[in-house]
């Protein structure tokens, strides 16, 4: 199997509840390595740019407002089938529909404040990683 990289955000709701460590533990327990990570407070411009594909959707304004409401953790995860594995760890977008044991089922309160974001494909992962990290901020995990 090929080693992939994917992008993840621990959203403001999960950061505010001190769930960063629990979420990182789930990544690592599933065999994903964290190869880049930083805490940032998204500006409106940065959030609007990241979610630009949703700009015409009715929830766009509320999404940007939520994502700028507090700090987030952005990270690059690496491992076999990283994109799919991370999406399985996160669970369904709506926590009410997420399987027990997933981040969203266990740690999220609503579809609007659902604790985590994860890339949905290799192409979006590459774009999202480049949006937040330069190549020299990503560290190879050779040990």
Curated annotation (Swiss-Prot):
Its cofactor is Mg(2+). One of its GO terms (biological process) is GTP biosynthetic process. It catalyses: a 2'-deoxyribonucleoside 5'-diphosphate + ATP = a 2'-deoxyribonucleoside 5'-triphosphate + ADP; a ribonucleoside 5'-diphosphate + ATP = a ribonucleoside 5'-triphosphate + ADP. Keywords: ATP-binding, Cytoplasm, Kinase, Magnesium, Metal-binding, Nucleotide metabolism, Nucleotide-binding, Phosphoprotein, Transferase. SUPFAM superfamilies: Nucleoside diphosphate kinase, NDK. Its EC number is 2.7.4.6. ATP binds at residues 11, 59, 87, 93, 104, 114. It comes from the Bacteria. Belongs to the NDK family. Homotetramer. NCBIfam families: PRK00668.1 (NF001908). This is Nucleoside diphosphate kinase. The gene is ndk.
